[in-house]
Amino acid sequence: MHERNTTTNTPLDVTAQKLLVAQRSVDTLVQEGVLHAHMSIGLGTGSTAMPAVKRIADHLARGTLSDIAAVPTSFQTALICERYNIPLFSLSSKRIGGKLDVTIDGADEIDTQNFVIKGGGAALLQEKIAAYNSAHFVIIVDETKVVETLGTRAALPIEVVPEARMSVMRTLQDWGLSVHIREAVRKKGPVVTDHGNFILDARWQSLPTRTPQDMERALNALPGVIENGLFTERTVRVFVAHADGSVEERSASF
C-alpha cells in the first residue's frame, strides 16, 4: 500500500517532517488498535523516534493508552521515557518474556524493498534485538531517508569488539568497502557503544554485488562482529513524511 494524505502550502523542513511522521504514525496505530492497552512496545533511538516516544506519552496522559510496558533501545531512550513517566522494562523481564508486541523506530536509510540501514546513533544492537523479537516492526522516516539503493547516503554501521577492529576492517576493505572507526564528538577516541564495543562505518565504493540480505548475514559471520545496521529479515510497516505535509504508508496494514 502506498497511501499519502494531508498537504500544506508551506514546505516542511526535515525537523518538521520528523515531528509529523512521529505523531501521525503513533496516532494511526492507536486508532487502528495496533497500539493498545497492556502492550509491550520497543522504543527506538534517534531524532525521529524521540517525538514518537513523546506522542506515546501524550496518549498515556489522555487515557487512549494505558498499562503499556516499554523496552528502550538505548540509554537516551530510557531517559526520555523516565522524563515522561513511561513504564520501563527490559526485554528479559518477566512481563516481557523476550517478545515484544510492536517496535517503533527511525532509520538512516530505507530502500524500495523496505530494507533498512540503522545505527547512526550507535544503538544498532539493541535496536535489532527489539525489532527482530517484535510481532510488528514500524519504521518512521522523513523523505530524505528514502533511497533506491542502500548505502547511497548513509554509512553502514558495524558493531565490533575492540580486539577485532583491524581484522574486520581488513576484510571489509577486501570486499571493496571503505571503512573507518567512528570517532566520538565530545571525547577523544572512538565511539563506545552501550555494550562497550566500537562502531565501524563502512561505505560501498561501487554498487554492492551482494544483496542486502546476503550482506547482513555475511557481516555477522565475521569473527568479532557483534551486529550490523542492515535490517532485512523483518516485514516492515513504513511511514514516510514528505515536505508537502503528506504522510505515505509504504507497506500493507497489519
Curated annotation (Swiss-Prot):
The active site is at 127 (proton acceptor). Substrate binds at residues 45-48, 105-108, 118-121, 145. Pathway: Carbohydrate degradation; pentose phosphate pathway; D-ribose 5-phosphate from D-ribulose 5-phosphate (non-oxidative stage): step 1/1. GO terms for biological process: D-ribose metabolic process; pentose-phosphate shunt, non-oxidative branch. Keywords: Isomerase. Homodimer. Belongs to the ribose 5-phosphate isomerase family. Catalyzes the reversible conversion of ribose-5-phosphate to ribulose 5-phosphate. This is Ribose-5-phosphate isomerase A. It comes from Treponema pallidum (strain Nichols). The gene is rpiA.
